[in-house]
Amino acid sequence: MKNFYPIKSKKELEMFIKTDRIACFGSDKISFEKKLRNPFKTNLFNFLKLLRKYEYLCFKRDSSKNAIKSKLTSFQIKLIDIKKNNLSLKLDIEINPFHCGKGVRICHPNVIINGYTGDNCIFHGNNVIGNKKTGAKTDIPKIGNNVDIGTGAIIIGDIVIADNCVIGAGAVVTKSFTTPGTVIAGVPAKEISGEK
């Protein structure tokens, strides 16, 4: 499966980073004091910034026709990957590159995202978004924009979650919900309400 490159220019990189900063801190301008008072958010934003740079540099390397520039970019990617992975361990968060839309908001640690998520998704913590036991890269969830995923919610398998859905705390989602604005809860998850 080929990589999907969401960030193809420096301008797009800056836009992704700005949107992630606003999602983390509620503002594009962050004071030094605010960073000190919120170490989790500060480290999370630094992780997301490294993730976005990694995604951009992968596109730059793979689209380069110059072998020397490509090798230099590969070296940059390795350095960023090491920093990103160290922060990932510190935060207890795992997000696969090229899988997460801009403006992601993670409220608490223990989040694994191995599925495609749209823009402005909220993860409240202790969430797993992943594939079934087959391990195939195609058996992963596709989550729309503006989806709010409650604490402890798990989304597994080759399923689709529509835009603007809310997934309740502790829900185990193993089937698709394609109606936008659906409230989903339970084990196994079922529709509680939808947009009217």
Walk through the language-model features, giving the residues of each.
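Residues at secondary-structure transition points
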Residues: 44, 137-138
